[in-house]
Amino acid sequence: MNTTYSSFTSLATLFVAERSEQSPVSYDRDTVITWGDFQQHVATLAQQLETQPTQNIALCFGNSYLFAVGFFACCHAGKSIVLPGNYQPEALKELSEHYDLLLHDADVSVSEQVGSLLVKAQSLVGITLINEPEAKQPYFWRELKLAEIPVTLFTSGSSGTPKAIAKTLKQLDIEVAILDNLWGDTVANTRVESTVSHQHIYGLLFRVLWPLCSARPFSAHNLEFPEQIVHHADADTTLVSSPALLKRLSEEHNPVAIRCVFSSGGPLPNQAAQHSQLLFGSLPIEVFGSTETGGIAYRQQHVASTPWTLFPGVEAELNHENCLKLRSPHIDENTWYQTADECYFHDSISFELRGRTDRIVKVEEKRISLVEVEKRLEQLPWVQESVVIPMEESGRLTLVSIIVLNDKGSDVLNELGKGKFWLELRKALRNWLEPIAIPRKFRVVDEIPLNSQGKRQVAEIEKLFQ
C-alpha cells in the first residue's frame, strides 16, 4: 500500500481540498478503500440523511471506516452528532433521550424500541443503505462551518450514569491541528492500527480524525490481543493504544519495530512503558486528558517521575488544594475548568501528577485517600499493581483491594501461604497507614479489570468480593 502523502488539511476543508481519488483512506485485511470511495460513500449517506426530519443522530459502529462515513455524512447533512460510549442495547436505550435516530453497522445490536438505520458493508468495497438508491450525482461539497456542528460525547460511566459532554467540531479540529504540529513529522507516511474505540474522544481524534486530516490510512477494525499487534505492525505503523493492552505485552512476544506508539485512558506503569520500548523500539507517548477537557498534557516516561508537558494553547494553574485548573480552546477558552487532579508544577508548562482528590472516602469518620493506600501497596516489594475500593459490608463501609503480584510476591505467597502472606502484607502497611486505612480483604488477580479505554471496571472488581 502506497502511503506517501503531503500536507495537513483542516476538518473544515477536508472534502474540498485537493487529494487524489486513489489515495488510501482505510483498509481491512486485503481490502483498501480509496479517497474516491470515501467521498462516494459519504455523499450517498449524506443525501439520505438530508431527507430525514431527525436532527440528533447517534453513531454506534464497530467498523471505524463506516463510523467515519457516518460522522462526515452527518456533518454535511447538517445534523448534530451523538457518540454513545457503550454498544450494549440497554445502555443505548438509556441514552435515547439524547438522539432521534441511531446509525449503526452489523457489529452493533440495537433494541427494536430505538429508531435506527443500518449501514452495511460488502467486503468494505461498497456501502449499502437500506431502501435507498445510489447517490444522485453530482454531490457539491462545501467547506464545513465547524463551530455550528455539535458533537456530544459521554464519559465512560464505568461507576455511574454516563454524563453527556457537549463539544463542537471546531474544538476537535483545534486538537487535531495541535497533534499534527507536535507529531506530524514523526508519524508521516505511516498507517494507523488501534486497540481503542473511536466512540471515545481519544480514539475519535487519534485513530479517525487526525489520520483523515493528515492522509494516513487507518484500519477499519481494532486489534484486540497483543499477538495481533506483533503480527500486523511494522516500522510504517502508528499504534494507538492504551495501558489496558500495553500492560499485557510480555517477554514471550517477538520484538517488532513500530514507528510511534500512543497510550491514553489511564496511567501507564513505568515497567510497561519500558517493555514497550524494548519490544517496539518506541517509547510510548502518553496523553493525559479526559472527555471533558480533551488533551491536557503528554510525556514519554523515561522514568516513573518524568513530568508531563502541557499541550500548546493549554493554560493551567493550581487551586488551594493544589488541583489542576485549566483554560484551553478544547474546552472553553474564556473560562477556567476545575479538575480533581492534584499536581506539582516544576515550571509553567511541566508538572507531576499526584493523584485525584475525588478518591477520598470517609471510613468511621476518617478521611482516607484511596490513591495513597494504592501507592503504599505498590511500594511493597511484592506488589506490581493494586486497586483499592470502598465496599459496604454488614452496613459498614470498609476498604478492599485487588493486587497483581510481581515474581517475588508470587514466590513469597507460595512459600508462606495466603494466611501468613496477608499478615505480612498488613504488617508492612502499618508502617504508613492507620489500621482503618488498611484493606480488610484482598484478592490476587493476573491483571486489573479495565475496559478498552483503560478505565477501571469497578463493577467487575466488586464481583470478586461478593
Each PLM stretch: what is its role?
Residues 3-4, 13, 20-51, 167-170:
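Conserved AMP-binding/adenylate-forming core of the ANL superfamily
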Residues 4-6, 13-21, 133-154, 185-192:
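Conserved pre-ATP/AMP-binding loop-to-beta segment of ANL
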Residues 34-35, 141-142, 150-177:
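Conserved AMP-binding A3 loop
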Residues 99-107, 164-182, 187-248, 285:
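AMP-binding/adenylate-forming
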Residues 250-304:
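Gly/Ser/Thr-rich phosphate-binding loop
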Residues 317-375, 379:
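Conserved ATP-binding/catalytic segment of the ANL
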